[in-house]
Amino acid sequence: MGLSDGEWQIVLNIWGKVETDLAGHGQEVLIRLFKNHPETLDKFDKFKHLKTEDEMKGSEDLKKHGNTVLTALGGILKKKGHHEAELKPLAQSHATKHKIPVKYLEFISDAIIQVLQNKHSGDFHADTEAAMKKALELFRNDIAAKYKELGFQG
């Protein structure tokens, strides 16, 4: 289920727009994740106290974590599917330390798509959305395979 060179180029083009404000995009992705799936907030001790969208928007810690999440994802996307080295430590920490179910990775993938649609509607056409969804699915499938290797049933 790999992406063609053309699809990767589309993904990296839109990702270039994300990189102009990783922290802002990341914060928005996490806010959308927590609003759409409040149960995911339970996995984040640092953010459990944030109950409203305004509190989330005002949280520098949430913004920093959003930056961390999207920086890691960007590093993976830039590998165009050859992301074994980047994926292994991420899968390890998310399986053994954070215990993040694959389902939550689907939720955050949806949030990423929604934020891109919202912030970059003029550039986020059907082909862009399809390519990004495919790239995020590849990432999730590869994380799920690593989880299985680690014995995590997430």
From Swiss-Prot:
Binding of O2, residues: 65
Residues the record lists as Phosphoserine modifications: 4
Enzyme Commission (EC) number: 1.7.-.-, 1.11.1.-
GO cellular component: extracellular exosome; sarcoplasm
Keyword Nucleotide-binding applies: no
Keyword Transmembrane: no
Record PTM Phosphothreonine, positions in chain: 68
InterPro entries: Globin, Globin-like_sf, Myoglobin
One Gene Ontology term from the biological process aspect of the record: removal of superoxide radicals
Reactions it catalyzes: Fe(III)-heme b-[protein] + nitric oxide + H2O = Fe(II)-heme b-[protein] + nitrite + 2 H(+); H2O2 + AH2 = A + 2 H2O
Compartments (UniProt record): Cytoplasm, Sarcoplasm
Quaternary structure and interacting proteins, as annotated: Monomeric.
PANTHER family reported for this sequence: MYOGLOBIN
Family as reported in the entry's similarity comment: Belongs to the globin family.
Designated name of the protein: Myoglobin
Native species: Lycaon pictus (African wild dog)
Lineage of producing organism: Eukaryota, Metazoa, Chordata, Craniata, Vertebrata
Gene name tied to this protein: MB
